[in-house]
Amino acid sequence: MYCPFCSANDTKVIDSRLVSDGHQVRRRRECLACHERYTTFESAELVMPRIIKRDGSREPFNEDKMLSGLTRALEKRPVSMEQIELAVNKLKSQMRATGEREISSEMLGDLIMAQLKELDKVAYLRFASVYLSFEDISEFADEITRLGKEKNGKAKKAKPAKTAK
């Protein structure tokens, strides 16, 4: 690596450690020519899959677009920006884990809906109303009923069984 101070090519690594939950390496370096020290950060360059839109067109993945959609759905809900950013990172990991170079916008929408369902049910309904193109109030009611059944089903499973004494 070239020294940022004197442009010499010989530098040595003094210290290396993982940062950002193991997603980056922080290296402390020293130039062998001018003896200046500086810090570098290294991270893997991960390529996100392209998105295949409903009309068949393709576009590069746009993290800002996904973040704004999540933020819009979660507007005025008790979810912190940190939780939203964690959700975005989880979604990006899920997209990369498919191993595909391209994924459909439907698949991405399904991943987003699953993430919103975990974060906030009201935000999930907001997003679903647009994503699933609800036509009337009965479709809202059906989705709310489905959410209620899922919640009740999980609650029943979570309760420990009573034992006789």
Swiss-Prot record:
Residues 49-139 form the ATP-cone domain. Keywords: ATP-binding, DNA-binding, Metal-binding, Nucleotide-binding, Repressor, Transcription, Transcription regulation, Zinc, Zinc-finger. Pfam families: ATP-cone (PF03477), Zn_ribbon_NrdR (PF22811). Binds 1 zinc ion. A zinc finger (unnamed) spans 3-34. GO terms for molecular function: ATP binding; DNA binding; zinc ion binding. The keyword Transcription regulation applies. Its cofactor is Zn(2+). Disulfide bonds: none annotated. One of its GO terms (biological process) is negative regulation of DNA-templated transcription. Belongs to the NrdR family. Negatively regulates transcription of bacterial ribonucleotide reductase nrd genes and operons by binding to NrdR-boxes. This is Transcriptional repressor NrdR.
